[in-house]
Structure formats: C-alpha cells, structure tokens
Amino acid sequence: MNGITLHKGDLPDGLDFGPVVAVDTEAMGLNLLRDHLTLVQLSSGDGTAHLVQLDRTYDCPNLKKVLTDPDVLKLFHFARFDVAMMKRWMGIDCAPIWCTKIASKLARTYTDRHGLKDVAREIAG
C-alpha cells in the first residue's frame, strides 16, 4: 500500500479516481435512523486509500460528485448498508454500483460463506 490520506470534511478539488472506485463507509452503529455516517473510504486500486472524515453537516460536494458520477462504477462489499447510509445522511443516490457480496452469491453457489474475508481469501489467495 502506498498510503492512507485523511481528508477532513470533503475530498480535495480535482481528485480523479478513474472509471472504478472501491467504497466503504463507517457509521456510529448499524441503525440507519439513529447512527450517523462518519467516514467514507475510497480507493482506485493504486495502493492509496482516501478516508473522508465527515462532519454532521455532510457538506461535501466533491465526495458527492464522485459517488453520483454516472461514469464511475462504485465497487462495494455489502452495498446495501453503505448505499442506504449515504442516502439517509448525505442525501445522494450512489450509482452505478457493483456489490461483491451479491456477485459472490451468484457465482459461488457451492458455499454460504460470502463475507469479504472469505471472498478475498478464495479469490486473491
């Protein structure tokens, strides 16, 4: 990994992730109505992770632009939670998306183990 870059509040202007970006979110808990979204993590696969620490205003136009860009595929594992949290707290419809958990369930029908650790272990070794 080349590094981790922490951004407070929003991504900097002009940051380009290319045609695909991996996305993960962190929240204060798992309750969509109660627990605030606190962090969005993004990586284009170049070895750098961009962490956006959000405040409760969710005033992050650059981050929202990336997450709603129709020309950028957003890659998630268990997208249902992340997409719902972003809709609830940021007010955006994140699209287009690809969920590796759903892909695993469709392609790996011989198992019921579709967590990120199990999928990564089998695919990446």
Residue ranges and their predicted role:
Residues 1-118, 122:
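Conserved RNase H-like, two-metal-ion catalytic cores of nucleic-acid enzymes
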Residues 125:
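Nucleic-acid-contacting surfaces of polymerase cores and analogous helical-repeat interfaces
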